[in-house]
Amino acid sequence: MAIKSVGSFILTALISTPLCSFAAQYPLTVTDLDGRAITLQHEPQRIILQDGRDIMAMALLDRDNPFRRVVAWNNLARKQDINTWKMLQEKWPQSAQILDMGFSDKGNVDLESVISRQPDLMIAQLRAKPALEESGVISKLSALNIPVLFVDYEINPGKDTAPSIDLLGKVLNREENAKAYTDYYRQQLDAIRQKTANITPKANVFVEALAGNSDACCFTHGHNGWGGLVEAVGANNIGSQLLPGASGFVSLEKVISMKPDAYIMTGSKRGNSQVLPLGLQADPQEVNRQAERLLSRTGVSNIPTIEAKRAYGIYHHFYNHPWNIVGMAYLAKDIYPQTFSDLNPDDSWHYIVRHFTTLPDLPFVFSWQQGE
């Protein structure tokens, strides 16, 4: 769905700092995505990012430099999304000097090194809360009066992503920047949902998350992550019907028996991995070669959906990403191609980059379609 460009004077206004009418007053008490009341005594200036993908949220808010306030983070891009890290490092070279604490969902971290950076806020993903509690990270930070603010793009992505960005905008005194993005986000999601609301029967979709990352097929998500995104665009996620938890493996025989209407593989460029190397500055020929190899795996080629050429690939990190509206656009087009024949998800990414950030608008390959 192409979006007409606006005048340069509007673009300048969009990427400028917030107007005083949105200025936050501190001390400030907010309710995070875990339903907890969090009080901040002053505007946070030294932030920990438990999940490094939140740097893309910071890019929407601190547009001149999303690393300006970050003193420690889990640099997932360096490990799992090589070209995104290259882009960030080239644009903001100081990012390479920020402590990479390797903060895992299991709560493993050298907390003393993190605390030595004198943080005044930790932004964390809600899915990590149990591990952070069990490891004592939350209690230790609380004892030092360092607030932990939970956001969510994965447990319930269609519902929680926009409120998470609004929350961060309020906490970081960037409400106008946040609102500009979330207004766009909600408009795009509403447009998708209006088109799929009356579709019956709903398409049945299987998402093989990180296809090729394991010798076994088929790893997938339940109601969260990719499952939540599939459901948000008006389709049935097969993993939600079969898994007791957030993610897990479904046997190939079971996938075949479920007769999905669309088979979607996700991936990103991550070293020598065998997954789809989708992402910024990806090589379309490399993506196509890897996709064809994945579809030729023993048994996978026998899935009726693949025989019918209804297999697709999508950039993996949309499953837990503040820009997941782009991922939902790709899903909508892949799952309901006739309904969304005029939708161009690439345009959504370009629009976000150009209107809500100062990131370079690099070429990318975020999707793949069988037979093209």
Question: Which residues are covered by each model-predicted region?
Answer:
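Bacterial N-terminal signal peptides
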Residues: 8-18
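N-terminal ligand-binding lobe of clamshell/alpha-beta domains
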Residues: 22-372
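Positively charged n-region of N-terminal signal peptides that target proteins for export
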Residues: 1-5
